[in-house]
Curated annotation (Swiss-Prot):
Pfam families: cobW. This is Urease accessory protein UreG. It comes from Rhizobium leguminosarum bv. trifolii (strain WSM2304). Belongs to the SIMIBI class G3E GTPase family. UreG subfamily. NCBIfam families: ureG (TIGR00101). GO terms for biological process: urea catabolic process. Homodimer. UreD, UreF and UreG form a complex that acts as a GTP-hydrolysis-dependent molecular chaperone, activating the urease apoprotein by helping to assemble the nickel containing metallocenter of UreC. The UreE protein probably delivers the nickel. The lineage of its organism: Bacteria, Pseudomonadati, Pseudomonadota, Alphaproteobacteria, Hyphomicrobiales. InterPro entries: CobW/HypB/UreG_nucleotide-bd, P-loop_NTPase, UreG. GTP binds at residues 14-21. Facilitates the functional incorporation of the urease nickel metallocenter. This process requires GTP hydrolysis, probably effectuated by UreG.
Length: 203
């Protein structure tokens, strides 16, 4: 699909340690054989996430760009997305046939949102390790993202999180918006997320 911005732009946000980079890796590996894919990662002072994706062999290195946002990471995806838009423009110039660009935000809080000028579809990632109460705490990431991913479901028994409670709270907080439980270590939930992107993104 070519959106009004060119390739479909998928924003991936969430707190530090929720599994954003693991999700980005799994999506790249699941989609790269059928689509032309690239990634822009955001870190405050380094390009660590971009380097990690290269090490994971998610994509060739020329399809992964890391940007250093400085300051608050949410600014670079919402108030002033210039640095990300420039990175995407560079990818488009280098790889004209791009179908999808994943934009991975730096670790942020529950109030983080993507500018509509930057992302066509938004995915927000939380972890059961942050506590079963996270879905009911709300915030734009929980309530307004196009897809909520509740990651690390395999660790629920070890951190005292009740998945049924999280399911109930996510259903209530998100109304009709979809969410999925995942375990990125084993790849559980990835196929559902890819299907969502195909359907909602017109891929």
């Amino acid at each position: 699909m070519k959106s009004r911005n060119g390739p479909l732009r998928v924003g991936i946000g969430g707190p530090v340690g929720s599994g954003k980079t693991a999700l980005t890796e799994k999506l790249c590996k699941a989609m790269r054989d059928n689509y032309s894919v690239a990634v822009v990662t955001n870190d405050i002072y380094t390009t660590e996430d971009a380097e990690a994706l290269v090490r994971m062999q998610a994509l060739p290195s020329d399809r992964i760009v890391g940007v250093e946002t400085g300051g608050c990471p949410h600014t670079a995806i919402r108030e002033d997305a210039t640095i990300n838009l420039q990175a995407i423009a560079g990818l488009n110039q280098r790889i004209p046939d791009l179908d999808v660009v994943f934009i991975e935000s730096g670790g942020d809080n529950l109030a983080a949102t993507f500018s509509p000028d930057l992302a066509d579809i938004t995915i927000y990632v939380i972890s059961v390790c942050q506590g079963e109460e996270i879905p009911r705490k709300g915030g734009p990431g929980i309530t307004r993202s196009d897809l909520l991913v509740i990651n690390k479901k395999d660790l629920a028994p070890y951190v005292g999180a009740d998945l049924e409670v999280m399911d109930r709270d996510a259903t209530r907080m998100r109304a009709s918006r979809p969410f999925v439980f995942s375990d990125m270590k084993r790849g559980d939930g990835v196929s559902s997320i890819v299907s969502f992107l195909r359907e909602q993104g017109g891929l």
